[in-house]
């Protein structure tokens, strides 16, 4: 059944899809992701069907205090680094190398544990010569694709909760969407 679908990725430029199907997917909170001619996700369909909790959620989101944002960011970074550690373990690498980073994240990640851990993570996973870049050599394109799919899944969950993914906590720039 359609309600069991979490995500549909439309990659091929020759795809034909009907409006009733798109409406049914959106109605069932399916993340419909559209890709460009390089098969990179560029956008996602979202429901504009307003409900009473959406307005309340948006008001709450806009009113979040700076200390609360910093604590939320701290928790996100701790989880991100802990998950990177788990990936290293699954890849047969030393997962404990990231422990000092996720155990010492400060409010708002004021001393950039995320960035420091990322360097250690990527070097551990792919070797010291690997450089993580938006348009870099492989496997960057695959990582970027996966990241776009994950970002769409998070956006879907936020939208489903009445929150706007565009109003992030930090990481605001043209190239990096709000987080």
Predicted features along the sequence, with ranges:
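Active-site helix-to-loop segments that bind/position phosphate- or nucleotide-bearing substrates
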Residues: 27, 39-178
């Amino acid at each position: 059944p359609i309600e069991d679908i979490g995500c549909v990725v439309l990659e091929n430029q020759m795809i034909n899809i009907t409006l009733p199907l798109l409406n049914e997917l959106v109605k069932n909170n399916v993340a419909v992701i559209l890709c460009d001619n390089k098969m990179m996700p560029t956008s996602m369909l979202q429901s504009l069907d307003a409900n009473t909790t959406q307005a309340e959620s948006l008001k709450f989101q806009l009113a979040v205090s700076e200390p609360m944002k910093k604590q939320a960011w701290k928790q996100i970074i701790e989880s991100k680094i802990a998950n990177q550690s788990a990936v290293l373990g699954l890849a047969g690498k030393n997962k404990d190398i990231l422990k000092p980073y996720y155990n010492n994240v400060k409010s708002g990640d004021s001393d950039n544990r995320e960035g420091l851990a990322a360097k250690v993570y990527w070097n551990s996973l792919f070797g010291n010569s690997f450089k993580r870049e938006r348009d870099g050599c492989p496997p960057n394109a695959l990582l970027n694709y996966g990241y776009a799919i994950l970002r769409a899944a998070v956006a879907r969950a936020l939208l489903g909760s009445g929150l706007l993914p565009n109003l992030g906590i930090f990481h605001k720039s043209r190239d990096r969407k709000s987080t």
